[in-house]
Amino acid sequence: MNATEAPRPPLPPFDAEAAARKVRMAEDAWNSRDPQRVSLAYTPDSTWRNRAEFVSGRAEIVAFLRRKWARELDYRLIKELWAFHGNRIAVRFAYEWRDDSGQWYRSYGNENWEFDERGFMQRRKIGRAHV
């Protein structure tokens, strides 16, 4: 993040309304399936644990999302606020997608988010199951 990058409200500490708004903003960005747009919500050195995969920094986030959406076609996501405290938010999610053979899948899971003081996500941990 450079000095000219504006904060991303709402900023922590979160109340219920701000946490719900942050979740909706993330849902909208992910449903755009635009890796660059999604990556801008994270700090330049953001770290992710996505099941067994570890991602660090915006460039790796963009690469991860490109790979993900190349195989998860017609991706559609719903995120729901689960809990929040201070600069942390927990989310439940469900999404549907199909592979290139036309087989549809549904994935469920939870995410734990930690934000910096400027409203950028600095840490994201996810657990997910496919059905």
Model regions and ranges:
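Short, low-complexity N-terminal intrinsically disordered segments enriched in polar/charged residues
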Residues: 1-44
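A beta-strand edge to alpha-helix "cap/lid" segment located at domain peripheries
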Residues: 2-14, 63-130
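A solvent-exposed, acidic/Ser-Thr-rich amphipathic alpha-helical stretch
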Residues: 17-21, 35-88
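Sequence-pattern detector for short linear motifs
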Residues: 25, 52, 126-127
